[in-house]
Swiss-Prot record:
Record organism: Flavobacterium psychrophilum (strain ATCC 49511 / DSM 21280 / CIP 103535 / JIP02/86)
Role: Catalyzes the conversion of dethiobiotin (DTB) to biotin by the insertion of a sulfur atom into dethiobiotin via a radical-based mechanism.
Protein name, UniProt field: Biotin synthase
Family: Belongs to the radical SAM superfamily. Biotin synthase family.
Pathway(s): Cofactor biosynthesis; biotin biosynthesis; biotin from 7,8-diaminononanoate: step 2/2
Gene giving rise to this polypeptide: bioB
Domain of life: Bacteria
């Protein structure tokens, strides 16, 4: 029987990651079966409710306003548009809808009120609702919880050390603080990262240390393979090899046994065989739909064919945590405080991010 731990060291995690592959897979698959049904995989749909125009400089992201990419910015979707997309996702087999907005942080006002109504609407469809909206305060987290939010996503992206090579417009500590604010409510935490950004194996282990030492550990950990987008500072990074993804999934499963490990961005470059190995290694959640915010993703019908081929079943909603109750806006205990929190603005610069900022296409 595996033991839940919150004191993993970087050295221990590197040693696990570098095990002979057959030993690594056997250990990960054995632990996976202790805590989860190996033939059940959660299907989530990621919906970009507000695209582009983000003031941040995340080196991997085509939604940053400072980079010249082919992304077309869109204003916040309406509640009815979101409801229609959620119903479509539900009919395709998704049990969770994750709404993403390209914001640095949530600001109190009409747009946030609209997002809260989206959360209420989707929760009433008996689907898990997740949001990724940037940094949030404790009061904003409580307002989301009252609306019926099931999960809040805020990825650490990478290790604290390598983070400074990826993003200069906010600090790693802001990520941790946002997760802490979510933990003051009944909302579950979704937090993971990206591999393939030029980081070392030590950095991958460092990210897993940061995640696994959170108490409690995140209920969901997305593992993304970088999708290099033209116009971003990471446009020339080489694609992640499937073996790296398998090792990362397996290592995550071993050190966080109860967590749902989500096979996220980068699946377009993975064969069915590669994805099957990831499921065997402990991945038990995917994002479905033709796009992940702005990057291509396998068609949901193709995913369902893969599920049938592998004998996998989509997970039903609220399997891990019971459905939250929706409190209507008029009955809410928490109101807008008009907060203007002082999130950090690190003073360092990242040369390749600066080079791409404001540079037009030839």
């Amino acid at each position: 029987m595996s033991v839940m731990r919150n004191n993993w060291t970087k050295e221990e995690i590197i040693a696990i990651y570098n095990k002979p592959l057959m030993d690594l897979l056997y250990e990960a698959a054995s632990i996976h079966r202790e805590y989860h049904d190996p033939n059940v995989v959660q299907v989530s749909t990621l919906l970009s409710i507000k695209t582009g125009g983000c003031p941040e400089d995340c080196g991997y992201c085509p939604q940053a306003a400072r980079y010249h990419t082919d992304i077309e910015g869109n204003d916040l979707m309406s509640v009815q548009q979101v409801k229609a997309q959620a119903l479509r996702a539900k009919s395709s087999g998704s049990s969770r809808v994750c709404m993403g907005a390209a914001w640095r942080n949530v600001k109190d006002g009409p747009e946030f009120d609209q997002v809260l109504e989206m959360v209420r609407t989707i929760n009433k469809l008996d689907m898990e609702v997740c949001c990724t909206l940037g940094m949030i305060t404790e009061n904003q987290a409580h307002r989301l919880a009252e609306a019926g939010l099931y999960a809040y996503n805020h990825n650490l992206d990478t290790s604290e050390e390598y983070y400074k090579e990826v993003i200069s417009t906010r600090g790693f500590e802001d990520r941790i603080e946002t997760i802490a604010n979510v933990r003051k409510t009944n909302v579950t935490v979704c937090s993971g990262g990206i591999i393939g950004m030029g980081e070392s194996i030590g950095d991958r282990a460092g990210m897993l240390v940061a995640l696994s030492t959170l108490s409690p550990q995140p209920e969901s950990v997305p593992i993304n393979a970088l999708v290099a987008v033209e116009g971003t500072p990471m446009e020339e990074e080489k694609p992640v090899e499937i073996w790296e993804m398998i090792r990362m999934v397996a290592t995550t499963r071993i050190i966080m046994p109860e967590t749902q490990v989500r096979l996220s961005a980068g699946r377009m470059n993975m064969t069915r065989e590669g994805q099957a190995m990831c499921f065997f290694a402990g991945a038990n959640s995917i994002f479905a739909g033709d796009k992940l915010l702005t990057t291509p993703n396998p068609d949901v019908n193709e995913d369902m064919k893969m599920f049938e081929m592998l004998g996998l079943n989509p997970q039903k909603p609220f399997t891990k945590v019971s459905q939250p109750t929706t409190v209507e806006a008029k009955d809410s205990r928490y109101e807008s405080l008009g907060e203007k929190p002082k999130w950090s603005r690190p003073s360092h610069t990242i040369e390749k991010n600066l080079e791409l900022s404001g540079k037009g296409k030839n």
